[in-house]
Amino acid sequence: MNSRREVSISKCLQGFFSEEGTLSKSLPSYEFRPEQLAMATAVARAIETERILLLEAGTGVGKSLAYLAPAIIHAIQEEKHIYIGTGTKTLQHQLMEKELPFLKRYLESSFSYALCVGSENYVCERRLGGGAFPGQEDLFPNPDEISQLRAWAQTCRQGLRSELDFPCSPQTWHQICRVPELCAGQKCPKGGDCFYQRARARIARATVRVGNHHLLFADLQSDWEYLPPRIS
């Protein structure tokens, strides 16, 4: 794919979705769907003309790829970031685990993507270790859960609650998750090892940022508390 608008988004999509395009040549089971290409082209035109677009499509059209592909092509060409908002966490994870890896493989262009969730979804190792309130570790509601969480925090990938493979009560998680009011920021002894700060760095670098509608509007109201500034 050429960059910097040497080729229009619509032409790139034609070369990707059409009966003679990249997907058809790469995937023996690929079935060309005119509705999918039409939807993707409509999204591309809306992006190129900076207009708002509302679309509705039936089951089996391939809606996710139809709006993701033109948005990603635009982001790559213009060296911008895009935020994909969803209504459910299920769709968030579907995009992260299925559609985006698929597009990264077959769009023939390099881009990165990251999941955006509220900061309360991340464990705070300082709070988990008792560092937020030294000498008050006995305030933890369930010592057994805390022991499990401390062991888990040593091996988990991103420090997300969704990564837990054992039950954790809401009360316990509330005691050890990241909350803005108790975050030590630059003074935190965890520094660059903080799960939340590492996630913010990944999101800042990502071409595609996937979150939900609630997080986006919460960020707008709180002056970009959760996401890095400037979603474009």
Predicted feature residues:
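SF2 helicase catalytic motif II
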Residues: 229-232
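Flexible, glycine/threonine-enriched loop-and-boundary segments that flank and lead into catalytic domains
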Residues: 217-223
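Walker A/P-loop
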Residues: 49-70
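A substrate-engagement module of RecA-like helicase motors
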Residues: 1-26, 79-207, 214-217
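Conserved pre-motif I regulatory segment
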Residues: 4-55
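Short, surface-exposed connector motifs at secondary-structure boundaries
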Residues: 49-53, 77-83
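Walker A/P-loop NTP-binding motif
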Residues: 44-45, 65-78, 98-102
